[in-house]
């Protein structure tokens, strides 16, 4: 699991769902939370939270697209297996672990030092209260 600490800067809620914007060292990370602000104490502006996402929930791109949760980085390390590959991407000093199929790595022409864009779906970012 990857964990990035940040502070909630905005909450947009409707029908028991919230779109939460968290300011982090990477930039703004957006997450969808299945609770109303009154139900989850940490879903409030200025609250410190952890943004958590699995290594398998990260998509790497070689070209920039117009999307939220898109962060530029450089591949710091790459362990290529027959089927799966594990990568570490440095995004503004934050090390993000990524798992891709080795076929994806080959198709994208990825290697150590390659500049990439990391894309996270807001639906796959989990927010957790950060100890004050």
Residue ranges of predicted features:
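Short, acidic/hydrophobic/Gly-rich beta-strand patch recurrent on exposed beta strands
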Residues: 19-25, 32-33, 86-92, 99
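A short macromolecule-binding patch
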Residues: 28-34, 52, 95-101, 119
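Short, conserved beta-turn/loop elements at beta-strand boundaries and strand-helix junctions
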Residues: 11-17, 78-84
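A generic beta-sheet turn/junction motif
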Residues: 15, 24-26, 53, 82, ...
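Glycine/charge-rich catalytic "coupling/switch" loops of P-loop NTPases
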Residues: 2-5, 10, 37-74, 103-132
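Residue-level structural signal for beta-strand termini and adjacent loop
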Residues: 14, 35, 81, 101-102
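Tandem CBS (Cystathionine beta-synthase) repeat/Bateman regulatory domains
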Residues: 7-10, 20, 27
């Amino acid at each position: 699991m990857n964990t990035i600490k940040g502070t909630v800067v905005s909450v947009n809620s409707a029908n028991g769902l919230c779109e939460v914007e968290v300011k982090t060292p990477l930039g703004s990370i957006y997450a969808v939370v299945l609770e109303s602000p009154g139900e989850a104490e940490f879903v409030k502006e200025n609250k410190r939270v952890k943004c958590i996402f699995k290594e398998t929930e990260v998509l790497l791109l070689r070209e920039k697209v117009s999307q939220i949760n898109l962060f530029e980085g450089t591949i710091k390390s790459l362990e290529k297996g027959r089927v799966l590959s594990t990568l570490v991407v440095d995004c503004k000093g934050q090390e993000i672990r990524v798992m891709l199929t080795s076929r994806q790595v080959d198709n994208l022409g990825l290697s150590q030092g390659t500049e990439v864009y990391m894309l996270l779906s807001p639906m796959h970012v989990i927010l957790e209260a950060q100890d004050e």
